[in-house]
């Protein structure tokens, strides 16, 4: 089924220019949204807790900053870009008490709304504008007169203008220059979590560690194992990112291509796909989010223990040593003000 696409001519920038936008959070996406909204002629304020380390940066970049509660009280469009695990508390304590009929509540990711951790009042529009790229790229593309593709979704639309408002917001951050895809909170949330857990983060990490362990256990130097399964991964992913699987195989040697075709299905087989389906079901039925919330409420003990275990893996030890030799890595990303 083809998804509905929107571009510059489909969005009216004046809609969001006639609203007051409060951006809650100033991380990767928060800074990109706030600065680009401002540059598009939108009234914008940033909501951060007193004492937040990001406050001086916001002020240096010429934006107004106040507490989340005061920003929510001032705004009639509130974009929630705080971390997923902090959003429900911020909503309950700072945003919800200050929402007015006719306001709009926007999100950059649908998790909290889709799984019922945030339940907006019925007289407020609820929509999502989610750029498919990190904040520094969103901002850089905007400054260059281009844009990053976005997803938009409308979950609640009491006045019938939710989509037009979301598209206007997307235009203000450059999204309609590249293209905006209409989706749902359900589809965005579940596909995002599935991709992270089975491929992008969880699956890739475990594949890399397993390959490293097999080579080291077979007697090969850890340094060579690191180069072959982790360092060179970026080269392959960049090729896929630029032109798909065909571009990747076109660019590698015939030996690598032939070996990949033969051996890849032996590593990722029907059993792997079935376990991926199990993970998808756990996402869909809320089991994963239940575990996430329970860990947050328990002080993130499981997350901290898993982080500790990961940091102690031998691939991290040898990787640190090798990356110290590479002058082109581990440099901070430059933000475009």
Swiss-Prot record:
Gene Ontology MF: a single term: NADP binding
Pathway note: Amino-acid biosynthesis; L-isoleucine biosynthesis; L-isoleucine from 2-oxobutanoate: step 2/4; Amino-acid biosynthesis; L-valine biosynthesis; L-valine from pyruvate: step 2/4
Catalytic residues, chain numbering: 109
Residue ranges constituting the KARI C-terminal knotted domain according to the UniProt record: 184-329
UniProt domain KARI N-terminal Rossmann: residue ranges: 3-183
Cofactor note: Binds 2 magnesium ions per subunit.
Record: residues binding Mg(2+) 2: 192, 228, 232
Enzyme class: oxidoreductase
Keyword entries, A-Z: Amino-acid biosynthesis, Branched-chain amino acid biosynthesis, Magnesium, Metal-binding, NADP, Oxidoreductase
Positions annotated to bind Mg(2+) 1: 192, 196
GO biological process: isoleucine biosynthetic process; L-valine biosynthetic process
GO cellular component, one term: plasma membrane
Regulation of its function: Inhibited by N-hydroxy-N-isopropyloxamate (IpOHA).
EC number: 1.1.1.86
Binding-site list for NADP(+): 26-29, 49, 52, 54, 84-87, 135
Cofactor requirement: Mg(2+)
Domain of life where this protein originates: Bacteria
PROSITE patterns xref list: KARI_C, KARI_N
InterPro entries, alphabetized: 6-PGluconate_DH-like_C_sf, KARI, KARI_C, KARI_N, KARI_prok, NAD(P)-bd_dom_sf
Functional summary from the UniProt entry: Involved in the biosynthesis of branched-chain amino acids (BCAA). Catalyzes an alkyl-migration followed by a ketol-acid reduction of (S)-2-acetolactate (S2AL) to yield (R)-2,3-dihydroxy-isovalerate. In the isomerase reaction, S2AL is rearranged via a Mg-dependent methyl migration to produce 3-hydroxy-3-methyl-2-ketobutyrate (HMKB). In the reductase reaction, this 2-ketoacid undergoes a metal-dependent reduction by NADPH to yield (R)-2,3-dihydroxy-isovalerate. It is also able to use 3-hydroxypyruvate (HP).
PANTHER family in alphabetical order: KETOL-ACID REDUCTOISOMERASE, MITOCHONDRIAL
Subunit structure: Homodimer.
Family note: Belongs to the ketol-acid reductoisomerase family.
Matching HAMAP family: IlvC
Protein's recorded name: Ketol-acid reductoisomerase (NADP(+))
Organism: Mycobacterium tuberculosis (strain ATCC 25618 / H37Rv)
């Amino acid at each position: 089924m083809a998804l509905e696409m929107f571009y510059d001519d489909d969005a009216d920038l004046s809609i969001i220019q006639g609203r007051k936008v409060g951006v809650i959070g100033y991380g990767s996406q928060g800074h990109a949204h706030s600065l680009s909204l401002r540059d598009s002629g939108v009234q914008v304020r940033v909501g951060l807790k007193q004492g937040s380390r990001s406050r001086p940066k916001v002020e240096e970049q010429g934006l107004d900053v106040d507490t989340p509660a005061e920003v929510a009280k001032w705004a009639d469009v509130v974009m929630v870009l705080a971390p997923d695990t902090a959003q429900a508390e911020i909503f309950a304590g700072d945003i919800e008490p200050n929402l007015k009929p006719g306001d709009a509540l926007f999100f950059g990711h649908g998790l909290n709304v889709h799984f019922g951790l945030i339940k907006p009042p019925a007289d407020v529009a609820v929509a999502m504008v989610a750029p498919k790229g990190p904040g520094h790229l969103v901002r850089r593309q905007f400054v260059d007169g281009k844009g990053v593709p976005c997803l938009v979704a409308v979950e609640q639309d009491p006045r019938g203008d939710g989509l037009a408002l979301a598209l206007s917001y997307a235009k203000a951050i450059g999204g309609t220059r590249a293209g905006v895809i209409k989706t749902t909170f359900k589809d965005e949330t579940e596909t995002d979590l599935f991709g992270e857990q089975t491929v992008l983060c969880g699956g890739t990490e475990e594949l890399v560690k397993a390959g490293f362990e097999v080579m080291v256990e077979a007697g090969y130097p850890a340094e060579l194992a690191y180069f072959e399964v982790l360092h060179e991964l970026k080269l392959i992913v960049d090729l896929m990112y630029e032109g798909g699987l065909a571009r990747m195989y076109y660019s590698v040697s015939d030996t690598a291509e032939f070996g990949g075709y033969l051996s890849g299905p032996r590593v990722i087989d029907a059993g792997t796909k079935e376990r991926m389906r199990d993970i998808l079901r756990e996402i869909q039925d809320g089991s994963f989010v239940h575990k996430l919330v329970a860990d947050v409420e328990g002080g993130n003990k499981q997350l901290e223990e898993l982080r500790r275990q990961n940091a102690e893996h031998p691939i991290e030890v040898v990787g640190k040593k090798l990356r110290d030799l590479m002058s082109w890595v581990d440099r901070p990303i430059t933000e475009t003000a």
